[in-house]
């Protein structure tokens, strides 16, 4: 046991975390070209992160909420969360110091009409950093839901949106118990005006504002820099390091940086003569094609990246041509899919059209692209699933402008250097759709990373 522990330490370099910076550095511009071994951007201190998070949240509340409520013709939107049981929309509206709902937190947005500002009310015992107006005096009305009913009666909205949905968890935050309590407090007339807040929820969560897109490239660059470290001889010693070693290196690296993964990192190995993807305790060897799937959460935005690396054999100086061509095939499918983004087009249509075009070019694709942003697998229409390349209800919704995406897909190809073995060339890169063009947030991998001699 002791020898195994010591050996695992010797296989992976423990890299010192850079000091936390007290202020944001100049923004990194969006780029179509990905750097092969980028420097790690400065990581903000927790205090500075809170300033950024709260500033963006205030701007989103000021701009996105009026836009989506007026798009949907909803004049009152009500959401509820209970402590440690936050629904996803409410969780995204809490300031940086409000780490969960308190007791029962009820948020109300009301549009008075005629272009007047949206009212933002919190019917709870605790304020939310001045972002919502406290609107409950328990000493006057102890029943919290009756206080909500009184607010609604005073405003007499035509539509009362609450979050329930059969399709998406993002729009299904109202629990049965709380719905029953709310319904009991509301008048029969107002109960009849309840509508689903599903679309409001999706639009709030999927919409990215300019301030977020100014930050996003540095966040994706951070993920790319960490992947570049993982796919290097700093971390990987062929013949010694296992796939699981690299997975746990990622976790330790993020902990040292004060960052969070939103899923456990993946490392897979494809090897000449071996079927499928090897993982876990499999030792990485010369001649292996490595795959990683890695995502972080930072400043309330998420990344999701899949890259490939090749471990040179002794005497080799470059990636075998058949493997290099396989990645180019996946890049071509990325191009086809990006060209098929269109405002209002259902995700299903974008997937089916792209897949058909790729197959017509002689490629063997599987497309499973998803929105990203506030959540890793974000709100909005799916564009295919790895296990379903046909119509899916979750892909029926429209593609909207000002949304971020993980362009996730694969192609399969027979590699001559491996005796015609069928190899899986998985790729995933984060991108932004402005309504006209899909642009990569920090470029995309177009060449397989080379892991050479020490």
Model-derived segments and spans:
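Positively charged n-region of N-terminal signal peptides that target proteins for export
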Residues: 1-4
């Amino acid at each position: 046991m002791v020898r195994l522990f010591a050996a695992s330490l010797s296989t992976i370099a423990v890299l010192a975390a850079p000091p936390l910076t007290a202020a944001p550095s100049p923004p990194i511009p969006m780029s179509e070209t990905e750097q092969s071994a980028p420097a790690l951007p400065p990581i903000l201190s927790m205090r500075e992160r809170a300033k950024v998070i709260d500033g963006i949240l205030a701007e989103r509340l000021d701009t996105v909420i009026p836009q989506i409520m007026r798009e949907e013709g909803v004049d009152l939107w009500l959401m509820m969360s209970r402590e440690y049981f936050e629904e996803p929309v409410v969780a995204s509206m809490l300031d940086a110091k409000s780490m969960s709902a308190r007791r029962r937190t009820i948020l109300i947005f009301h549009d008075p009409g005629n272009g007047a500002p949206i009212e933002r009310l919190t019917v709870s015992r605790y304020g939310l950093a001045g972002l919502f107006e406290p609107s409950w005096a328990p000493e006057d009305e102890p029943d919290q839901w009756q206080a909500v009913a009184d607010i609604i009666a005073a405003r007499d909205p035509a539509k009362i949106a609450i979050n329930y949905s059969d399709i998406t968890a993002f729009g299904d935050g109202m629990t049965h118990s709380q719905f029953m309590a709310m319904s009991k407090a509301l008048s029969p007339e107002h109960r009849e005006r309840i509508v689903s807040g599903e679309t409001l929820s999706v639009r709030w969560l999927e919409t990215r504002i300019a301030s977020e897109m100014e930050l996003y490239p540095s966040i994706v660059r951070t993920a790319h820099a960490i992947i570049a470290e993982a796919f290097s001889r700093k971390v990987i010693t062929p013949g010694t390091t296992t796939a699981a070693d690299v997975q746990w290196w990622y976790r330790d690296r993020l902990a040292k940086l004060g960052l969070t993964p939103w899923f456990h990192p993946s490392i897979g190995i494809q090897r000449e003569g071996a079927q499928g993807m090897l993982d876990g305790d499999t030792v990485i060897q010369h001649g292996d094609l490595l795959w990683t799937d890695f995502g972080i959460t930072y400043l309330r935005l998420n990344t999701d990246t899949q890259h490939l690396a090749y471990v040179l054999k002794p005497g080799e100086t470059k990636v075998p041509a058949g493997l290099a061509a396989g990645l180019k095939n996946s890049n071509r499918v990325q191009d086809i899919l990006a060209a098929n983004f269109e405002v209002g087009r259902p995700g299903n249509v974008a997937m089916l059209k792209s897949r058909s075009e790729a197959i017509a070019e002689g490629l063997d694709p599987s497309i499973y692209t998803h929105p990203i942003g506030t959540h890793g697998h974000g709100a909005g229409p799916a564009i295919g699933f790895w296990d379903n390349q046909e119509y899916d209800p979750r892909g029926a919704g429209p593609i909207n402008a000002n949304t971020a995406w993980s362009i996730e897909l694969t192609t399969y190809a027979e590699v001559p250097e491996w005796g015609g073995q069928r190899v899986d060339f998985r790729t995933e890169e984060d991108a932004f759709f402005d309504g006209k063009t899909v642009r990569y947030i920090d470029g995309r991998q177009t060449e397989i990373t080379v892991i050479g001699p020490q």
